[in-house]
A protein has these predicted regions:
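Short, solvent-exposed amphipathic alpha-helices that sit
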Residues: 12-26, 102-109, 128-147, 188, ...
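Flexible loop/hinge segments that line or gate small-molecule binding clefts
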Residues: 38, 60-105, 184, 210-222
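An alpha-beta-alpha
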Residues: 104-145, 250-267
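Periplasmic-binding protein-like
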Residues: 3, 55-62, 119-122, 153, ...
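Short beta-strand elements in bilobed, periplasmic/extracellular small-molecule ligand-binding domains
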Residues: 24-35, 119-120, 138-160
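Amphipathic helical "hinge" segments at domain boundaries
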Residues: 1-49, 53-57, 135-138
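Hydrophobic alpha-helical segments within soluble ligand-binding/sensing domains
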Residues: 93-120, 135, 139, 159-168, ...
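Flexible loop/turn connectors
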Residues: 95, 166-280
Length: 281
């Protein structure tokens, strides 16, 4: 089985990959891994390499600009399951998170703590999961009559230097909190906050997706989304094995939408953990 993610070193994907590998072993499958680094050419090359190695099926995290590559895999009747992200108007089995709900509820957690000037830092990529998180953020701000305060800053996935400029400018506008669209962005953002001598959550409160070991963001944040890693891995592999076994009898596709768990920290815990993280940085 071939598993292609955006970055195998990212904790979220690394943990899912491990779950897939463990589950595949029980079914007597060997797993090959690859990373695209959000580059569609790398995805295309990996698909070709894996095909030459005789893989039975693929689990793929689509990257921006790779829609036609994914469609071509499907046209060739290669058993395929999409993970974490989807391709518009393509009948392929997938396992995804309810990202709109996650974006909404993490924003709402900040609002419940009394924050009104909440902005989001996201990627400029048109990925389904990122856009849905942004939509959830916007909907929540509008539902709480804070739509005029809703601002989304977009960064390229390989251009993190701008995040410091964004946070400095936001400080001048008295922004109170940030929602980060990914754990990588949260790590970069927290580093920028500490470099400038600001404190979390006294100067900026944060909410984010997943955990980031470098700064214990999950303890520092007001709220974070804990994604069901085990279910991502097992559900994706189960769907793929089913597709492999029924390869000669194409059937309907299955879309599994997982429910996010929103974890909120106690105010005193967030404060204590942030102070510890600042010292470490």
């Amino acid at each position: 089985i071939g598993v292609i993610v955006s970055d195998i070193s990212n904790k979220f994907f690394a943990d899912i990959a491990r779950c897939i590998e463990n589950h595949a072993y029980k079914h007597k499958y060997t797993v090959l891994f690859g990373s695209t680094d959000e580059n569609p050419q790398k995805l295309e090359n990996l698909v070709e390499v894996f095909r030459n190695k005789g893989i039975d099926g693929l689990i793929v995290v689509p990257c921006e600009g790779a829609d036609e590559i994914i469609r071509d895999i499907a046209r060739q009747n290669i058993p395929l399951v999409l993970l974490d992200r989807e391709v518009p108007d393509l009948e392929v089995s997938s396992v995804v998170l309810n990202n709109r709900r996650a974006g909404y509820e993490t924003t709402e957690a900040l609002i419940r703590r009394g924050f009104t000037r909440i902005e989001m830092i996201s990627y400029s990529m048109g990925l389904s999961n990122i856009r849905e998180r942004e939509e959830g953020y916007r909907r929540c701000m509008q539902a709480h009559e804070m739509g005029e305060n809703a601002v989304i800053h977009h960064l390229r996935h390989d251009k993190f230097a701008k995040i410091e400029e964004i946070i400095r400018e936001a400080r001048q506008r008295r922004v109170e909190a940030f929602l980060f669209a990914t754990n990588t962005l949260a790590g970069q953002g927290l580093s920028a906050i500490f470099r400038n001598g600001w404190r979390v959550p006294q100067d900026f409160a944060i909410a984010c997706f997943d955990t980031n070991e470098a700064f214990d963001i999950y303890k520092t944040a007001i709220a974070y989304v804990r994604q069901p890693i085990e279910r991502f891995g097992t559900e994706a592999l189960d769907l793929l094995i089913k597709s492999i076994e029924q390869r000669d009898k194409p059937g309907s596709c299955t879309r599994i939408v997982l429910t996010p768990e929103i974890v909120e920290s106690a105010p005193e815990e967030a404060l204590r953990s942030a102070e510890e993280a600042a010292v470490k940085s």
